[in-house]
Amino acid sequence: KGAPFYDRDGNGVYDPNVDTPSFRDADCTATPDVCDANADQVAWYVINDLDEGAVQSLYGSKPIGLEVQNTVWGYARTDALGDAIFKKYKVIYKGTETTPDDAVIEDMYFAQWSDPDLGDFGDDFAGCDTELSLGYVYNSVDPDSHYRTFDLAPPAAGYDFLQGPIVEAEGEEAIFNFRKRSGFRNLPMTSFVFFAAGSAISDPDLGEYVGTEQWYNLLRGFQPQPDIFNPVDFVNPLTNQPTKFTLDGDPTTTSGWNDGIPLPAGDRRIVLNTGPFQMALGDTQEVLIALVAGISSEAPPRTVRTTV
């Protein structure tokens, strides 16, 4: 139980002088680099949605019986690997006492939501890179008032879907539990949305079921409106075309749709989504995310992309 480790001596007990903070279920023969990753710190925790009062006070939905086991690890290094924190989410559909045996979640999505507050929260920009499945935040001005105190250039930070949930795909191959699985593929980031605090588009409503409906639209790449049957698109202001990937331009070359149009810099939220996928009662899915950061004299978005 608890944070996973590679039990090198096979005694079933973690010995920091012998064992390695790693992943007990990894295939160490096929992927020895996983077992020898030698993370300098590994943390593990588990959460579920069975507290009906707590769950409904968030967005009004009732529990459905999801358990999430989260493993977080990092490295004390001076290279790019030391600028990343890794998070593996293991999602299990366990159900509740009233869940029927044949229950299936038909259209499930996974989101990485963030209120990044990069230094001074009032001067942030956001963006995404669809090829890297990356959503990021960077500073609109140089210097940032918080980092100027330390004589540092503004950094950039982002979240990257390294391994999305798996769906059936004939002839393809996915990674699941650090093992290859034939006949499946890993979903990439399927939409990226952002909104600015205080603007017309803001956080879903807390404490009411309408918040759940707004979130379901966000998860599918639409605006957080409550009508799930008639969702409202985000629109690229340069092309006037609907899009599920907001701010997908390149701020280092100023090509495409970049933040600052039409909203000024400010307090941003970013939401990276992947889906849909199905989960039958008893099924397990995994999502592996890297939180990456970079600080350099280069343009900050380029810095975080280079780190990825």
Language model segments and positions:
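Extracellular/surface-associated beta-sandwich interaction domains
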Residues: 1-308
